[in-house]
Amino acid sequence: MGDGGVDVRLMLPGKPDHWYADCVAESYFGELIKHGVKVYRYTPGFLHGKSIMVDREAAFVGSANMDYRSFELDYECGVMVYSAPMIESLLEDMDMIVDHSRLVTKEEWAKRSVLRRVFEPLLRLFAIWM
């Protein structure tokens, strides 16, 4: 459980489409893991859809990243879902993704390459545009 007893899971592609965006995302793993977030890498490959579920009562599904670029510059879309059957279906999809993913451990994250460690803070400067 994350801080406050909340079950937070972050599922990311095992094979990212842009190495530099992945490097920025990965730079936050240590802090997320420290606060109890479970970070997963989807091993079959790429994930692009975004979904958020809150207490099995509401969900967001769409293409939009939760960032400045998606909300201000790009034309992304998503829907809020309040239907119990749709939320249960989404939960089944999320569980399937977790079943086909590997959990990123604090130890694994700490062993990332020196090159990534050098690039992370530099690329974070440009994160708002990625």
Regions of interest found by a model, annotated:
Residues M1-M130:
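PLD/PLD-like phosphodiesterase catalytic module centered on the HKD motif
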